[in-house]
Amino acid sequence: MKKILFLFTASLLLHVTLQAAKISDVASIVGVRDNHLIGYSLVVGLQKTGDGTTSKFTLQSIANMLKAMNIDMKPIDIKSKNVAAVVVTAELAPFARQGDKINITVSSIGDAKSLEGGTLLMTPLKGVDGKIYALAQGAVSIGGRNGKGAGDSHPTAGLIYDGGLVEREIAIDLYNQDYVTLSLKDANFQNSVSIQKTLNGYYSTEVAVAMDSRTVKLKKPSNKTMIEFLAEVQEINMDYNVQDRIVINERTGTIISGVGIHIKPIIMTHGDITIKITEQENPDKPAGSMVVDENMVIGLNENELYTKEGTTTVANLVRSLQKLGATPKDIISILEAMKSAGSISAELKLI
């Protein structure tokens, strides 16, 4: 059984960083957001890379389209492989006006091999309320070729730049409002209060009230319009508390961590790996050891891992586990178990 032994002395308090940030970077205005749009259509003009005859919905869609053009044909009689059924999606930005252009994403839902060279037929795009907000149409782009872009790796999805035309606006009236609400991107009582204190100090009057860890209510000054007020608010710097965070992509095995995130004492076993983290000052370097970095050494005889002077951090742990041949899946499982046991105080975010 492989053993990993960490010996360290350090403060184990939760590490929180204080930094300056614009309010616009940490909070958004409630009600001012993108809106998802979706539609269904056909991409035509493919070079025999479209849906086959097993995609019955594609054949039915072709028949329906032809019928709308006064051409009567049964789905069973259609043999074309130059057409693909697709889902069409887009984001309608806040304050988008009728006639504005938006980008369109096209994704195959049948067994098409590629959408390269295809043209999306006119597609109504609807919101969650079922109303049509935009129309999409145009040539589909699937990126680069010869392994240099997204085209070769994922040819069944593509983009149409400026391929959508806004037909209906979403009404957002900020100008006539006296109050608006800010929503913090990450809930944090300290940051909510920091916005309140910063704005009230800046305007020398109470214009902001922290309602909870995510919400701050704003009242515009009497000598400004709401638009002028918000334009100023978004550019004001505040003291922003950033808690340490470990980001894990379970699909790719990618782990992103700050270098100073400490690990509290713990003893755990994962498969054939035993991890023991204890407090001990100035441990002796084991005989026959190999240096991992300036803080850690591995005892080659027993596959034990030691720290020298300094602290045991997530970054040290990950590097050391890699030295011992642990897989990304093993490392992710170990970090998740440590977080559950309270050995890691940083936020663990899975994506």
Curated annotation (Swiss-Prot):
Principal subcellular localisation of the protein: periplasm
Residues annotated as transmembrane: none
InterPro entries reported in the protein's UniProt record: Flag_FlgI (IPR001782)
Biological process annotations from GO: bacterial-type flagellum-dependent cell motility
GO annotations of cellular component type: bacterial-type flagellum basal body, distal rod, P ring; outer membrane-bounded periplasmic space
GO molecular function: structural molecule activity
Locations listed in the record: Periplasm; Bacterial flagellum basal body
Record key words, sorted: Bacterial flagellum, Periplasm, Signal
Signal peptide limits: 1-20
One protein family per Pfam: FlgI
Keyword Ribosomal protein: no
HAMAP family in the record: FlgI
Entry-linked PANTHER family: FLAGELLAR P-RING PERIPLASMIC PROTEIN FLGI, FLAGELLAR P-RING PROTEIN
Subunit structure: The basal body constitutes a major portion of the flagellar organelle and consists of four rings (L,P,S, and M) mounted on a central rod.
Function recorded in the entry: Assembles around the rod to form the L-ring and probably protects the motor/basal body from shearing forces during rotation.
Stated family: Belongs to the FlgI family.
Protein name: Flagellar P-ring protein
Native source species: Sulfurimonas denitrificans (strain ATCC 33889 / DSM 1251) (Thiomicrospira denitrificans (strain ATCC 33889 / DSM 1251))
Upper taxonomic lineage: Bacteria, Pseudomonadati, Campylobacterota, Epsilonproteobacteria, Campylobacterales
